[in-house]
From Swiss-Prot:
The active site is at residues 498, 502. GO terms for molecular function: endonuclease activity. It is an enzyme of class 3 (hydrolase). Possible endonuclease which induces a single-strand cut and initiates DNA replication. InterPro entries: Replication_gene_A-like (IPR008766). It comes from Shigella boydii serotype 4 (strain Sb227). This is Probable replication endonuclease from prophage-like region.
C-alpha cells in the first residue's frame, strides 16, 4: 500500500491542515536517523559527567561502608549461620588435633614450641627441623621428649620465678599489662611502657601527697612518708628506689635522715627515661635467663651468652663509636680535644686496661719475691644447681632456676665468709681475682694469691672448706669439680705468666688467637667477644685486686706527673714535683709505672686503707644533674701527712658536637652546602693570594712553618681564643692526602676461591665485588661489621677491638 492510500484510508486531508495550529505533530520515533537527533551541548556534557561522578562516588562510599561494617560492627554472634559454621570448623580442628596427639605425643611438644614467642620458638624449631631431616624417627622423638620437653617445663618455672606476685599486681593496673610480656618487647615498646609506668608513679605521688599542697608548714618527715609510698610502688616492680638504703625506715639509725636526697629520688621515680633504663635492663636479663632455660646458651649453641646479646653489644659499640667521632671536648679557653682520642687514651681502651693490670700483677710478684711469699693459683666453681646446661648441650636435671647473677652472688658471699674466718684465724693474703663464665654463663673464679709459706696449708684448707660446704654430697671424695689449688713452681713459670692468659682472654684476647678453648672449642680471641657482653649484661665484676693500695690514686698520680712535666718546661728531668719527699717518691714511682715501688711507698701490702699516704680526693659537682641533685666527681689527691688537696682536674671540659666540615658538606667547595641532591650555587671564586694570607680580622697571618720549636711554643701560647678557633677551623679544612691506586694481584685459582667464599657468605661474588676487595675496599656484612680481603683470605673487620 502506498503512502497516499494510507492517507486516504485514515481520512487525512492536507487541505484541512492549512494552518500551523491544526497541522499534525511529528510522531516520536526512536529509530530516527542520527543526523536528525538534536546536537549535544556543553551543558549536557557537564550534566552527564557529574551524574557519572556521583554514581562512582556512591559506589565507593557503599564499598567503604561495607568494609567499616565488616571490620568494626560485624560480629559472628549477629550471624547465627556463619557463627555455627566457624564453630564447627574449630571443633573439627580440635578433634583432629586431639586424635593426632593421642596417637603421636610428639605433636603436643611441637604445638607447645610453636606457641612460644619468636625468640624461643624460632631457634628451637630450627633444631627440631634439623633432627627431622636426619631421617631417624626414633632419635627425633627421643630428642623431643628428652630435650625439648624438659626445656619447655624449665621455661615455665623461670617465668613463674620472674613474675612475682607484686609484679603481677602492678601489671593489673590500667595500661601496665605489657609488664607480663616484658621479655618479648622491643626497645620502642619498652619506651612506651616506661612512659606509662612513670605516669602511674606520678598518680601515686599525687594520691600520697593528699593535703600537703594546701599547707605551707610541711615537716620533712611527712615528705619522707610520701616518698615511702612511691618507693613501695617501685619495689613492687622489683626495682630498688634511688637512695633507698639512706631513706628507708630503720630501728637503730645512727645518722640523721638525709632529707636532701628525697627530691632527686622522686624525680628519678617519676622520669620515663629512668624507668626505660631499668625496664630495658630487666627485659634483657629476663630474656637471657629464658634462653638459658631452653639450652640456647651453651657450647652447642652460643657460649657464655646468647647470640642476640652479642649482636646487641656490637650495635651498641658501633653507635658509641659514631657518637665519639661526632663530638669533641672544649674548655673555657677554646682548646678542643677529639673525644675518640680521649676515650682511646683512657682506661676504657682494652689495651691500656690490660697493660695496667699486667703491670700490677708483676708488681705483686716482685713484692712477693722480696718478702719471701709463695704464690698459689685457685679455681672455685659453683655447685651444680647453678649450672643450667650440661657439657653435651642437654638440660641439667639438678638446676634450680638459678640466674647468672645469683651464681655470682653465691661466690661473693662465700668469699666474704671465708675472708672473715681467715682474719679471725690471723691469716692474711693478697692478690687478684678473675671472674669468668662457664659455657652456660655460670660464674667461676680464678685467684692468684700470695701468702706466707707457713700459712699456705691452713689458708688452702680453710678455702676448700668454704668452697665445698654447700651440696657436699654431690662431690663424694673428689672435690676437684668445685675446688682446685696449685702451688706455682718458679721452674714452670712465674705467677704473672699463670694469670696472663686469664686476663687477656677476658678483655680482648690479645696474643691468644692460636689457642683453642677446651670448653667451647673456639679461639680464645673470639671468645673475648662473648665474654664482654656477658659481664655487661649480668653486671659481673671481672677483675678485683685485694690487699694492695687503690689503683685510682695511681692513675691520678700519673696524671699529675704529666701535667707537672708540661708546666715545668725547661726544668731538669727528675726534679721534685711535690714538696714532701715521701709523697714525691710515690709520685715518681707511679710516673715510672713501677707498681712494686708504688705499693711499698704507700705503706706496703696488707696495710689498711687509713694508713695509705696518698688517697683519691672527691668533691661535689657544681653543675646539677638532670634530676636536680649534685653528683660526686674526682678532684685529685690528698694526703693525711700534708695540708690541702692537689687538684688534677682543674680544667673543665664540655662535650659539644663537631662542626660540619665544608669539604664534606659540599663537594664543589661552594658558598653553602646544598639541602637537595644537586647544588645550583655557582662555583666559589678563587681568592687572591692577599685574601688568603689575611685572617678574619684583616691582619696578615703568621707563617708557622718557618718557626723552630721554641718560637712555635711561645706563639701558640700567646694566641687569643679567637685566633685559636680560627686555627682549629683552618686545620679542619686541610684536605686529606689521597691514597694512590692499589690493587692486590692474585692468581686465577685464588680468584675462583674468593668468588666461592663470597657466595658461601651470601654475596653475589660478582666482578664488581671482587675488584672492590682487591683494591682494598670492604663490604658490609651486617651488625656494623665489614669484610675485606687481606693475605689471600677474607677477614672480618674487628677494629672495634682496639677501641673498646
Amino acid at each position: 500500500m502506498s503512502h497516499a492510500d494510507m492517507n486516504n484510508c485514515c481520512g487525512f486531508n492536507e487541505a484541512a491542515a492549512a494552518f500551523s495550529w491544526n497541522s499534525p505533530k511529528k510522531a516520536i520515533n526512536p529509530y530516527l536517523d542520527p543526523a536528525e537527533v538534536a546536537p549535544v551541548s556543553a551543558l549536557s556534557n557537564l550534566i552527564t559527567l557529574y551524574a557519572a561522578d556521583n554514581e562512582q562516588e556512591q559506589l565507593r562510599r557503599e564499598a567503604l561502608s561495607d568494609q567499616v561494617w565488616e571490620r568494626y560492627f560485624f560480629y559472628e554472634s549477629r550471624d547465627p549461620v556463619q557463627h555455627e559454621m566457624e564453630q564447627d570448623k574449630l571443633i573439627s580442628r580440635a578433634k583432629l588435633a586431639h586424635e593426632q596427639q593421642r596417637f603421636n605425643p610428639d605433636m603436643v611438644i611441637l604445638a607447645d614450641v610453636n606457641a612460644q614467642p619468636s625468640h624461643i620458638s624460632k631457634p628451637l624449631m630450627q633444631r627440631i627441623e634439623y633432627f627431622s631431616s636426619l631421617g631417624r624417627p626414633k632419635a627425633y622423638s627421643r630428642y623431643l621428649r628428652e630435650t625439648i620437653k624438659p626445656c619447655l617445663e624449665r621455661l615455665e618455672h623461670v617465668r613463674d620465678s620472674q613474675l612475682s606476685a607484686s609484679f603481677r599486681f602492678m601489671a593489673s593496673h590500667v595500661g601496665l599489662d605489657g609488664l607480663l610480656i616484658l621479655p618479648e618487647m622491643s626497645q620502642d615498646q619498652v619506651k612506651r611502657l616506661s612512659t606509662l609506668v612513670a605516669a602511674h608513679m606520678s598518680m601515686c605521688l599525687d594520691a600520697a601527697c593528699g593535703d600537703l599542697y594546701a599547707t605551707d608548714d610541711v615537716k620533712p618527715e611527712e615528705i619522707r612518708k610520701t616518698w615511702e609510698k612511691v618507693a613501695a610502688e617501685t619495689l613492687r616492680l622489683d626495682v630498688i628506689p634511688p637512695a633507698f638504703e639512706q631513706l628507708r625506715r630503720k630501728r637503730n639509725r645512727r645518722k640523721p635522715v638525709p632529707y636532701e636526697l628525697i627530691p632527686g629520688s622522686l624525680a628519678r621515680m617519676l622520669c620515663a627515661d629512668w624507668w626505660y633504663r631499668k625496664l630495658w635492663k630487666m627485659r634483657c636479663e629476663w630474656r637471657e635467663e629464658q634462653l638459658r632455660a631452653v639450652c640456647l646458651v651453651s657450647k652447642k649453641a652460643s657460649p657464655y651468652v646468647s647470640y642476640e646479646a652479642v649482636m646487641h653489644k656490637r650495635e651498641q659499640r658501633r653507635k658509641s663509636l659514631e657518637f665519639f667521632r661526632s663530638h669533641e671536648l672544649v674548655n673555657e679557653e677554646g682548646d678542643t680535644l677529639d673525644m675518640e682520642d680521649v676515650v682511646n687514651a683512657s682506661s676504657s681502651n682494652p689495651a691500656h686496661r690490660r697493660n695496667e693490670m699486667m703491670a700490677c700483677v708483676k708488681g705483686l710478684e716482685l713484692i712477693a719475691e722480696m718478702r719471701g711469699d709463695c704464690a698459689v693459683f685457685y679455681t672455685i666453681t659453683c655447685p651444680s644447681r647453678f649450672h643450667s646446661t650440661l657439657n653435651n648441650g642437654r638440660p641439667n636435671p639438678t638446676w634450680t632456676n638459678a640466674t647468672v647473677r645469683q651464681s655470682s652472688d653465691y661466690l661473693v658471699g662465700m668469699f666474704a665468709a671465708f675472708r672473715k674466718a681467715m682474719h679471725k684465724a690471723g691469716l692474711r693474703w693478697y692478690g687478684v681475682r678473675v671472674a669468668e663464665p662457664h659455657h652456660d654463663g655460670t660464674v667461676h673464679w680464678h685467684l692468684l694469691c700470695f701468702m706466707r709459706k707457713k700459712d699456705r696449708r691452713a689458708i688452702t684448707a680453710l678455702l676448700r672448706k668454704f668452697a665445698i660446704r654447700e651440696d657436699r654430697e654431690e662431690l663424694g671424695n673428689n672435690t676437684g669439680p668445685r675446688f682446685k689449688s696449685e702451688l706455682i713452681n718458679p721452674r714452670k713459670g712465674t705467677p704473672t705468666s699463670y694469670i696472663a692468659k686469664y686476663i687477656s682472654k677476658n678483655i680482648d684476647g690479645r696474643g691468644l688467637a692460636g689457642e683453642i678453648s677446651k670448653e667451647t672449642g673456639k679461639s680464645l680471641r673470639d671468645n673475648a667477644e662473648y665474654v664482654n657482653p656477658w659481664a655487661s649484661l649480668h653486671r659481673v665484676q671481672q677483675f678485683r685486686f685485694f690487699g694492695i693500695p687503690g689503683r685510682q690514686a695511681y692513675r691520678e698520680l700519673r696524671l699529675l706527673a704529666g701535667q707537672a712535666a708540661r708546666q715545668q718546661g725547661d726544668k731538669k728531668a727528675g726534679a721534685p714535683v711535690l714538696d714532701n719527699p715521701r709523697l714525691d717518691a710515690i709520685l715518681a714511682a707511679a710516673d715510672a709505672g713501677c707498681f712494686a715501688t708504688y705499693i711499698m711507698r704507700q705503706g706496703g701490702v696488707l696495710v689498711p686503707r687509713k694508713y695509705h699516704l696518698i688517697r683519691t680526693a672527691y668533691e661535689i659537682n657544681e653543675e646539677p644533674t638532670a634530676y636536680g641533685d649534685h653528683g660526686i666527681r674526682i678532684y685529685g689527691i690528698w694526703s693525711p701527712i700534708a695540708e690541702g688537696k692537689i687538684c688534677t682536674h682543674a680544667v673543665k671540659w664540655k662535650m659539644v658536637r663537631k662542626a660540619v666540615d665544608v669539604q664534606e658538606a659540599a663537594a664543589d667547595q661552594g658558598a653553602c652546602a646544598p639541602w637537595t641532591r644537586g647544588n645550583n650555587c655557582l662555583l666559589a671564586e678563587n681568592l687572591n693570594q692577599q685574601e688568603k694570607d689575611k685572617s678574619a680580622d684583616g691582619n696578615p697571618r703568621t707563617d708557622i712553618t718557618s718557626m723552630d720549636d721554641k718560637e712555635l711554643h711561645d706563639y701558640l701560647h700567646s694566641m687569643s681564643k679567637k685566633e685559636r678557633r680560627e686555627l682549629a677551623a683552618r686545620l679542619r679544612l686541610v684536605k686529606p692526602k689521597r691514597r694512590k691506586d692499589y690493587k692486590q694481584r692474585i692468581t686465577d685459582h685464588q680468584r675462583l676461591q674468593l668468588v666461592y667464599e663470597l657466595k658461601s657468605r651470601g654475596f653475589d661474588g660478582s666482578e664488581k665485588e671482587v675488584d672492590l676487595l682487591l683494591r682494598g675496599g670492604s663490604i658490609p656484612s651486617g651488625a656494623g661489621l665489614r669484610i675485606f680481603y687481606r693475605n689471600q683470605r677474607l677477614q672480618e673487620d674487628d677494629q672495634w677491638r682496639n677501641l673498646y
